[in-house]
Structures are given as structure tokens and as C-alpha cells.
């Protein structure tokens, strides 16, 4: 089956055909690192991680070059530095490390390349100089501006006109502009701004605009035309529209051949955002839930659809994963099976149809249970192989059944192991009262003991 993805620019699904099947390029806008990421911020890395896994299955792991940037200079970062008294680099390094650890806990594979904006200021200046020479940009009193009217087809990605811009979309009002829709390529430094937010340039000291950062990083690491550019739907306009304007006017080549955008997460019927104050951070969620539960929950809705984030969604995701891991446990020792071409890949090849892929994963778990009921060794081995292959595509089932059932607290697990062994010893000694006491005590802690031919094991319930 061919891979079909919804291209925002074309407003329809298109068959994906890379420029070079041996080097498939993917660029996704990464975090602005000044605070903890909320769970809505985690949707793009999870969605595009699934896309990356599908691409790896089709073209090979080494063929996929995936860049996800770090925005480490921006107005909110500067404000955080001024408020805290910490250097900008201390803030950005701290929160970039936390972000990467958080998304790693969601089974997101690290990007091939993680460019930081501040490491690419010379490349940004080079693009701006080219835009000025080609009359697409001009120097004003407060900065260097891109002239939106100079690009006749500006707005083709989003289908929006410059005057359609809405509040909060990061297009600043400034009397220095020739046109209200013009946007900043370079911002001149203001009195009192921290020195670590200022660079020299041919036009004066200052810092780059937000949009030019991605244009420079994508071109340097992936080339002037990339296969797929992704991000949240809120970036479609103006950020991605402005990236197109800068890059294509500077280089005279198409920036991206396919554009993909994921939908919002809602909480209480409103878009989740820091400005609305209705956010829950990934960092906090990971204290209460396994990362795989968060990932599963994020995949329950199609990536372009809005997803209502609730406690019930997390509970349902945990229950479903418990059942799937339970099936995997029953066939875990059955090695040597062959994974067949299941419906998981077919679902994902149709514009990342994760709801259908998860339904197929559940069906594979039922097959594995049936094979275990029948004690069919070949079917059990194949069931194990099918589950693990499907899990690899989705970024799920990355733990052993025992690890999943017992959690990750090693010290606590050792204590429970000792209690279970004490119960085994009590049963051998026919001290039934002690054995029953231990079982009840563990049950009160949410631990279930399972006795079988191979001995006694336990799981959290």
C-alpha cells in the first residue's frame, strides 16, 4: 500500500513520494524552552514520531533524516531571564533537557538533528541579506522587515490573507512597518535588554525574528527543499506562512513538498494553552502515569482532530494497555514467531490513522489470547511477533509484561518481590495463615499475586 498523507497546502490527501528514497527529510518545529511543556506541546513530537516510524518501515531507519529544532531565543525567554535573573542559556539548557527527558518518556525517538536557534545566527543573517538585495525586505528604525506585499502568493499555505491575522498569532503592531502585515526578520536591541540576547549584524545590534530561525536551520541541515514540514495547526499562520515567504523568496525554491499539521488538545472545552492557564504539564503527568499511557491517549484521536484531554481518557488508555500487555504476557515465552503484514501499518499508511491502528492492536491481543487458550505454540509465537511488530510502529509495548505490570520503582519492586517470596516460603512450610496474611496485605497495596505452574508472580492492579 502507498503512504498517503494530508497535505495542508493541497487541502487533500496525497501519495507521499520523497525526492530521494535514500534520504527522506522531515522538519518539525520544536519547543520554545522557557518553561515546562504541557501535554498539548507533546502532541507534535508523538504524532511525528509515529510518522517517522512509518517512514523507517518503508525506507529504512538510516534513510530518515529528522530535524526538530530548539527555539532558545525569543521574547518569552528574555522575559523569563529578566524575571529570574538567570542567564538565558541557563534557562534554555534546563528546560530543553527537561523537554527531551519528558518526550523520551513518551517513547519518542530522539531526532537525527536537534539544531538550536542561537547556533545559526550567521545563517539567518545571510538569508536576510539576500532578501534585502532581492527587494523582499527593508531596514527600518526598529528592525529589518519582510515586505509581505512583495510576495504575490503569500498566504497560499493557510488560505488566509495577511489582514486575517488574529490576536496572539505573533504578528506585532509596529509603526515602523510599511505594511501592517510585514513581519520582523531582525529586531534591533532595546535599552535594558540583556547582553546575551543581542548579536552584531550589518544593520545594527539585535536578535533574529522568530520565523527566520526555522528557515535557516531547515536549509542548513536538510537542504533548501525538504520532503515534509510539520508542526501544530496553530503554526500554519503566520509562522509557516512566513517561513515559506522567507525561504522561497531567498532561495527561489520550494521550501517543503508536503505540509502536515496536528490539531489542538482541549481541556474543559477550550484549547489548552499557557496563556489561558488551563494546562497540565507532561512533567507532572509523568509522576502519576506511565509515559506509555500518555502516548496511547494522544494516539486515540486522529492527529488532525481535536482531542479532549480528561482523566477518563487516561484511565481508559491505562485499562486498554493493561489488557494488551496481559495478552503479551501469555505468549511472552513463545519465541521464533513471524510477524505478518497486519492492519496496523495499513491504517498508519492512510494519513496516520492511529485510531484504526490501535483497534487493530487490540484485535491482535485478542488473537494472542485465543492462541494461549488453545495452547497453540506456533500461533502463540506468531501472536507475540505480531504484537511486538505493531507496537514498534506505534511506539508502544516497549516494556516486558513484567516491567509493565510491576512499574518502574526498583526499590519498591524489590520489597514486593521479598514479600512474595516470603509467602512462597510460608506455603512450603504449610503456614497458611501467614501466606494469607501476606496476600491480603499486598492486595491492600494494590498488588495482586498470581500463582501458576511456573511459580508465583505479581502485578499492580
Swiss-Prot record:
Organism listed in the record: Hyphomonas neptunium (strain ATCC 15444)
Q: Which PANTHER family match?
A: CYSTEINE--TRNA LIGASE, CYTOPLASMIC (PTHR10890:SF3), CYSTEINYL-TRNA SYNTHETASE (PTHR10890)
The UniProt similarity line reads:
Belongs to the class-I aminoacyl-tRNA synthetase family.
The name on file for this protein is Cysteine--tRNA ligase
Question: A single GO molecular function, which one?
Answer: ATP binding
Coordinates of motif 'HIGH' region in the sequence?
31-41
User: Lineage from the top down?
Assistant: Bacteria, Pseudomonadati, Pseudomonadota, Alphaproteobacteria, Hyphomonadales
* Subunit text: Monomer.
What this protein needs as a cofactor is: Zn(2+)
